[in-house]
């Protein structure tokens, strides 16, 4: 299959790319590097990316940002960072990308444990993650041409422990192999509308 991976250079993305590249053709899209550049917060950039890439079999989004800050310090503009990037960025990848997926193709979006188990300073990120979960379940009901859509939601991954463990006291780090398998389940399985949770109650 021909897979397009946005965020393929990140902590999770590079491991996902390494796995799928063994058996599939991979196109990496990133804001500053990759085979093609894209800013998922800009729908025009998304359209240009798809025009450049052409028809594909699967789209994986492992990109998007949201503001982490104390609730009482978050401004309206702070919330819009996550809404424009991680939420609408992924929504627009689906909205626009459906015309570039071959029949039976799939979308795999990415969220995280904050949708179910938020921690301090993550109000905006948790809100965005929850919105994506609802979007995936609803969009799965209406996608045409046998297209599928799922979202992988991971906990604190092993490769990011040093950077984020202070925010997640008592959380058990998730092995990267387990996280990768979430993407494999979405891309190579037959399910749709699924929230593939890669954590066990923290």
PLM feature spans:
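Substrate-binding pocket helix/loop in short-chain dehydrogenase/reductase
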Residues: 70-71, 78-80
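Conserved NAD(P)H cofactor-binding loop of Rossmann-fold oxidoreductase domains
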Residues: 60-69
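N-terminal Rossmann NAD(P)H-binding glycine-rich loop of SDR-like oxidoreductase domains
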Residues: 4-19
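C-terminal helical subdomain
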Residues: 147, 151, 157-162, 166-202
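Conserved Rossmann-fold cofactor-binding substructure of NAD(P)-dependent oxidoreductases
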Residues: 40-56
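Catalytic loop of short-chain dehydrogenase/reductase
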Residues: 82-85, 91-92, 106-132, 136-144, ...
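Conserved mid-core alpha-helix of short-chain dehydrogenase/reductase
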Residues: 45, 88-96
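Rossmann-fold cofactor-recognition segment
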Residues: 30-44
